[in-house]
């Protein structure tokens, strides 16, 4: 049975009068008759303005690590509200939260706060340039690092002829200065030889290597530990700052993030999504000698940085993640969900694999998991694209684009989300098979 989006569709027409695309982020626009407007969220569930209830596996693209409207975090945020909000001065709480982050992430010797992942990566890139005196940077193909000009580029490999050299670099958006193109270089994930060749040719210009070891906007495709350690050595060899973007993986895949899982330390690292369980806060952290450049030539700031509400929420969220078994609960649920999905798919002879970590896993309809963005691009993802809307009608909300992982929160494990999800998944798979037959 198709759910009704009548009220969402009506509101969308009204919203178009004041908001481009009717929304406040391009990624929230799903089409004229498919864009959803939310009434409220609680735990691992959302309710839209039509009254449809969803088990949510987007979780705001990852921030909801504990669940929506978590009483523990919201009570702390309320106390933060009573502090007063924005002072353009500092509070003792900043030191306390920074100390917690340094405890959980050894690479985070010094910490600075911002409000979004984009801001954190901007700061990291500025620090890397200041530290090395080199302006260019490397981005891993398929990686996502926010919506600022320096990183809104991609390697156009769809029509690329490898015999003609490196793939052309194109802008993701209009309005980006073309002069910035010469500062962006790209490398495929899990190919250390390619990375080394790129550095041999351009190391005199490259000051930063930006990497998501688990690509949060590309099916959670994951770097091998061997690749990460090889990249670490190459960065040291060629005087390149290794920036590990943990905006999505940080405080989710492990207390110490993906760096803990793979046993290495970044020069600089960024965090955002899970830090405050949905309250706006982000982090740039790293080696003391690099971070000390802030105030010694490098500018970093922001009026709303360390708002008392967000900082209080972060303090409580990180306390829960550090001192309880919340992350293990999340991982166990994600593993059980994937096992249940596998049973359903195997019973129907559907080749598949899961990528990444159970807390933010990608579903890939091929028996061989992708090792980089090129593998995903060469795959047939039409089955996923057909399945996702069927799941939405059955009350399970995943991203319509297969590149976005399934995000798990602690609250999913506290109700009957798992059996409900698997029942809906089985129905959606059968409907998709009939549709594509």
Model-derived features: where do they sit?
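Conserved N-terminal phosphate-binding loop of PLP-dependent enzymes in the Aspartate aminotransferase
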Residues: 1-437
């Amino acid at each position: 049975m198709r759910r009704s989006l009548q009220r969402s569709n009506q509101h969308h027409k009204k919203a178009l009068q004041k908001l481009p695309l009717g929304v406040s982020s391009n990624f929230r626009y799903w089409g004229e008759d498919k864009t959803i407007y939310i009434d409220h969220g609680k735990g691992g569930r959302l309710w839209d303005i039509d009254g449809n209830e969803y088990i949510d596996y987007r979780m705001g693209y990852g921030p909801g690590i504990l669940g929506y409207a978590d009483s523990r975090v919201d009570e702390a945020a309320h106390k933060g509200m009573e502090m007063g909000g924005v002072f353009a001065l500092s509070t003792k709480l900043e030191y306390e939260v920074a100390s917690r982050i340094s405890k959980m992430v050894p690479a985070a010797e010094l910490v600075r706060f911002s409000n979004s992942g984009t801001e954190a990566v901007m700061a990291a890139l500025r620090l890397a340039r200041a530290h090395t005196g080199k302006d260019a940077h490397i981005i891993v193909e398929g990686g996502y690092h926010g919506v600022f000009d320096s990183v809104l580029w991609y390697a156009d490999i769809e029509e690329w002829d490898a015999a003609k050299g490196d793939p052309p670099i194109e802008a993701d958006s209009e309005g980006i200065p073309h002069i910035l193109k010469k500062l962006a270089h790209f490398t495929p994930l899990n190919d250390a030889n390619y990375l080394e060749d790129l550095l041999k040719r351009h190391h005199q210009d490259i000051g930063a290597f930006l990497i998501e070891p688990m690509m949060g906007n590309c099916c959670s495709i994951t770097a091998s530990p061997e690749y990460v350690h090889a990249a670490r050595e190459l960065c040291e060899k060629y005087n390149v700052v290794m920036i590990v973007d943990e905006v999505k993986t940080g405080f989710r895949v492990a207390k110490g993030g993906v760096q803990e899982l793979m046993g290495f330390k970044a020069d600089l690292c960024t965090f955002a999504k899970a830090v405050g369980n949905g309250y706006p806060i982000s982090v740039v952290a790293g080696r003391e000698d690099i971070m000390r450049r802030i105030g010694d030539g490098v500018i970093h700031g922001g009026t709303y940085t360390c708002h008392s509400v967000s900082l209080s929420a972060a303090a409580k969220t990180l306390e829960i993640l550090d001192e309880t078994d919340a992350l293990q609960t999340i991982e166990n649920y994600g593993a059980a969900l994937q096992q249940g999905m596998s049973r359903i798919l195997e019973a129907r002879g559907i080749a598949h694999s899961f990528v990444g970590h159970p807390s933010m896993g990608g579903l890939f309809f091929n028996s061989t998991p992708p090792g980089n963005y090129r593998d995903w691009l060469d795959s047939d993802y039409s089955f996923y694209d057909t399945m996702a809307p069927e799941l939405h009608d059955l009350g399970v909300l995943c991203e319509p684009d297969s590149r976005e992982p399934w995000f798990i929160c602690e609250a999913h494990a506290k109700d009957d989300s798992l059996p409900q999800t698997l029942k809906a998944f089985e129905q959606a798979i059968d409907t998709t098979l009939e549709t594509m037959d």
